[in-house]
């Protein structure tokens, strides 16, 4: 299938004097319908001994569902149910780490995250903190983690976030929303089972899928774009267009969106996201708006920066009869807007990717507030 050429307009150049990052990738992946059933076989060789448990962090949505009975519990393994109603917080990570350390004499054999982006990010952060001193907020930033994380496995139950493949774990801290960006964050193993996404409600499916779509648009139109990120971004965009604008079967749609999420995550791993994500962080920090919805609330007003992408987005919204919340920022005070603007502008790498090195002169605080006021 052909995607729109003007969505892939950045010219790729090379520079022999550039020092390139040596990014990590997930070393092992299982993909396929029903592949969750192989989890026991995957974990068995990684168990240290009978006293070193596997800790399963699971979205509490599944607490009374059949999925729990399929988890290969042995010895003193523990399941911890976690609510995904709110964005993952640094203090939440610290509390889980403390609970594990107080409960078990031996360090766990590994951490398994089962859920959407919130659970996948929590599991990555817990795996890091169990092998590193201090608190989660100490590692919010870039390359601050000094020791490898505990063995950890990611199993997404919704598609779109790219958290299963990324080298970041985005956390809401006391002062900022920022990821733990580290080579030690990436999962050691991922299981991609499209059947696990069957229970996802329609709107959540759409908003999380749009996270993936926006990853593609921001990556493919960014100044950080390179042939590596472009190849993944183009494939992810192609899959998103098939899923959200073409008539494919439900089963095929689940497969394609799960792979779009993977490819979209790979694209931004070697480039960066852009304006929608930076502004969404502000909405999440101040108003607690979930990431996928926040991206959509912002992206609909970014036609000046991503004209073709926003046009496609509106077609997707119309096709699936999605109603975005209105008047979200209507009653905010000037102090509220100052917080939104400061949080968003703090994401400097995202702005540089979107607008170039002169981004501070292009996106002034006043101009940014004007966009927020439309939401």
Question: Residue spans of the language-model regions?
Answer:
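Glycine-rich phosphate/pyrophosphate-binding beta-alpha loops
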Residues: 160, 266-290, 295
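C-terminal charged capping/lid subdomain of soluble metabolic enzymes
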Residues: 2-11, 16, 24, 313-375
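Carboxylate- and glycine-rich phosphate/diphosphate-binding segment that chelates Mg2+/Mn2+
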Residues: 168-270
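Short alpha-helical scaffolding segments that buttress acidic/His motifs in well-ordered protein cores
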Residues: 213-217, 257-265, 279, 299, ...
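Glycine/threonine-rich beta-strand-loop-alpha-helix active-site module
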Residues: 91-195
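Catalytic phosphate/nucleotide-handling subdomain of diverse soluble enzymes
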Residues: 281-320
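ATP/NTP phosphate-donor binding region
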Residues: 2-110
